Amino acid sequence: MSFRLKPLIVALFASQLSACAVGPDYIRPQAPVATEFKEVKGWKTAQPRDTALSGQWWEIFNDPKLNELESQVASNQSLIQAEAQYRQAQGLVQSAQSSLLPVFNLNGNFNNFKSAQGQTQVISGVRTLFGNTVAMAWEPDLWGKVRRQIEANTGNAQASAATLQALRLSIQSNLAVAYFQLKVLDAQRTLLDETVAAYQKTLDITKNRYAVGVVAKTDVVQADTQLQSAKAQAINLGVQRAKLEHAIAVLIGKSPAELSLAASALTTQAPAIPVSLPSELLERRPDIAAAERKVAAANAQIGIAKAAYFPTLNLAMSNGFQSTDVGDLFTVARRYWAFGPAAAALTVFDGGVKNAQYNQAIAGFDASVAAYRQAVLTGFQEVEDNLAALRILEEQAKVQDQAVASANQALALTNNQYQAGTVSYLNVMTAQTAALSNRQTAVQLQGDRLNAAVLLVKAMGGGWNETLLPTEEQAAGDRKWTDYLILPVDTIGEWVE
């Protein structure tokens, strides 16, 4: 390359970096945010050091088995797929960044030729011409199209990272909900086993009373009906439990055959969960962050569409050596260079394609803004839903405990009356059914409260916050100088082999 061309190349690079980028610069859109949650009265305001807001949020339930299962979520195949999609998005950022740089090609060649007869200035006979050339092609980013593409791809990569975290939180919460529901079924099974034992005892007593002529045969049949019905309910729980166990296995990346969970008592109570301010929710939920980053990407697409209206400039340059003697090919005397062609192009008629693409970009931006605001509203709804659920379920649980106590008392009184012969066995059956139903409801309420607690943590982001989003450098994969080579350094050995 001629020394006189070097200042020109430097100037072109500098002009590219300082040139304007057409299209609107990104401004985060306004979102509907309330000053406080409707259901927040009586709740503790979240603080940065609250355990419930940490990444290991499930530990607030103090269940070692749940902790063990949650630690295996990284093996979930959907999560692995999402992580790969994030790396794909990083690759798109890298590809866009590379478009800012010129492309260099190294060419080596030789040609055999024979001069025409009668050319006295050319040595006659067959000769070989050797050549070695480095060619450069470059399209300067005069209008910021490439830089806007980098912005768009960076926004999409950051959105992909946030989507990955949203999926992780969803899998974690689904696992916790399935686990607690399984424990509810175990508690229901324990309750039914106790009921079956009680009904069996009642049936035996009724048979003895029938044998001595105190009660009718119908009492024995009715007592046996109650017993068999309770047994059938207990067996039916096995179907639901098996499905939940299989679902848990898949959530942690295992086949159903690889996981068996022993039955355990339902002793976990819904913990107190600090609630953050509505304005903080925008920074804590990865799905909202993903929607906002998609808005940024859509905004950059407007600039890309607008840059298409402006002319493009393509530059080419070559530098190399030519000689008929390979021995002196790389000497100064055999060196040559060429600048050009330099070509500028401007589309003057395209049938409205660019206008359509620009309008499409504007519409895409508007759609992404609406999607972002909808994500915010949905986030607020989910927090309110689960705050209300926890409040109402707590009230219901208190009343239900009283109902269980009353039903148990009624059953005891009815049994005494039946043994005294003052009521029929139908009264006993009614009291038994009421007692069992109320106890089952109490167990289910405990599970519902645990589920609502899990979903509230999920609704508040599970300890995630915007600072965990990848930076622009991280969205590009923290590129090293070796990443700009044709072959990554760590794969050259593989290619050689």
Predicted features and spans:
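Periplasmic alpha-helical coiled-coil/stalk elements that build and connect Gram-negative outer-membrane
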Residues: 21, 146, 162-277, 389, ...
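Small/polar-residue-enriched beta-strand and adjacent coil segments characteristic
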Residues: 25-27, 56, 62-68, 80-83, ...
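A short glycine-centered flexible hinge/capping loop motif at secondary-structure junctions
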Residues: 210-214, 418-422, 459-463
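C-terminal structured "cap/appendage" subdomains that terminate the fold
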Residues: 414-450
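Short proline/glycine-enriched turn/loop segments at secondary-structure junctions
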Residues: 329-333, 444, 467
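Long, contiguous alpha-helical "rod/stalk" segments
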Residues: 80-93, 97-99, 192, 196, ...
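Terminal intrinsically disordered/low-complexity segments used for targeting and assembly
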Residues: 2-71, 130, 154, 238-283, ...
